[in-house]
Amino acid sequence: MKWTVREGKKGDMVRVHCNEQLDHYGVYVSDTEVIQFGKNPSLRIGATEADVCVLSTDINEFRNGTYPEFADMSFSEKMKRINPEKTVKLARERLGEGGYNIIHNNCEHFAYECVFGKKYSSQEEKVRALIKSTATGNKN
């Protein structure tokens, strides 16, 4: 999947870069609604995994000072995706859902499942490597 900075369309998968290794994902509905598996803005400082849930914010809150990128799907990906209206419906049905786990149930899993009907995260291996290097003191 390719990612570009452009105007979002209802049901698009959207991401922002958090740091060099990780991105944050959500489902774009409009500039006033992005549904994401994230931390409530009022709880960001000192928040734990237990505080993370599916919530709705606007695009400015979601982008947190960075530029949002929207998924530009190949023909094959477009054929596999759930239609945009149903994508938004699925995302909204999960508002308030918890159970966040950075490896097994993260924001990318959430967005991908809403768009394609199955969980997937390209970041799993990055997160595993980051956790391993932090635990062993490696800085690679």
Predicted features and spans:
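Short alpha-helix capping/helix-loop boundary micro-motifs
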Residues: 1-3
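Aromatic/basic micro-patches that form nucleic-acid/chromatin recognition or nuclease catalytic surfaces
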Residues: 61-95
